[in-house]
Amino acid sequence: MSALGRNLGNFIQTFSNKTSSIKTVNGLKRGLLPCCGSTVRPIAKDNHHQSPVLNVNRSSISGIRTELFNSNGLITQFQVRQYCSESKLQVSPTPKTLLSEICQREITDFKTIFEDNNNEVDSFLEEFGFELTKEGDQALLKKTFADGTNIVIRFETLEQPIEEDFDEQDENDQNERDEDDAEEQEEDEVEEEEEEQQEEEEGENDEELTEGAEEDSHEHPFEIEVTPKGNASGKLTFGCYASHDGNYTVSGFYKGGFGETVNPVDIGGTSMEFQDNILLVLQQYGINERLSFFIHDYVHNKKINDYVESFEALKDFVSKE
């Protein structure tokens, strides 16, 4: 029998049994353009940064599964699609129409779920008298105090992405699935021993948990440049971190302004008396919990606004005829 006859026979057999010999192609999402024969599928990416696409070997693709040929013969959701006879591309509903609707849903979700903290940002500027300026992807807060001291606070306006190792995560998941009953029993015994140790060393464990929570919190770095009145050569720069809960950390300082190459003093290696007093001095110049909240809210608001504006721009593009 010829190849054409065998293929035709297989098609008739599978169609009569309400099954399909068509295989699934990894990477096609939501069934958009199901007949375009795309050989591109996305790979894992972190945060909102775009990652390069991965080309799929066409020899491994025999077709695209659709809901028209599901094995149970039932169609839960079906939308009539029309295709251009010449290009074989979907024309109704068009991909642009579907994408426009998806963009609008994303815009609505961002505006509904995430709070608008612009009022808190404006309130801080009015109360503490800082002047806000922008230089590229950095924001600057400037103020001259009554004693003539000039303070400049600088921080990045782009939120730093949290790096994720997807390959390592997949490997860990596979290892967990491969664990046998003996290993699970051993883990249970270890957990029982740990519980006993936790009861005996409750205070020490609480301290470790607190330190772990501080390390997991997403902090925003910022710098403070202090210029004494009439002494430009006596500039000092402090390195700090602002947390989402209002806490902040002063990690070090050095003589000089922004960008100067100087070995900083690690405040963590100084005495508690020094650390307490340096915090009190900086509080006199507006370095406090309100500033920490301001930096976090400002970066967070910019991130949400950037997302919304990007979706709106894409929606406007696909909405044009």
From Swiss-Prot:
Gene3D superfamilies found in the cross-reference section: Mitochondrial glycoprotein
Annotated segments matching region Disordered: 157-220
Bias (Acidic residues) ranges: 161-214
Coiled-coil ranges per UniProt: 167-212
One GO BP: cytosolic ribosome assembly
Alphabetized UniProt keyword annotations: Coiled coil
GO cellular component: mitochondrial matrix
SUPFAM superfamilies documented for this protein: Mitochondrial glycoprotein MAM33-like
Top-level taxon of the source organism: Eukaryota
PANTHER family: COMPLEMENT COMPONENT 1, COMPLEMENT COMPONENT 1 Q SUBCOMPONENT-BINDING PROTEIN, MITOCHONDRIAL
Full protein name: Putative uncharacterized protein DDB_G0288137
Species of origin: Dictyostelium discoideum (Social amoeba)
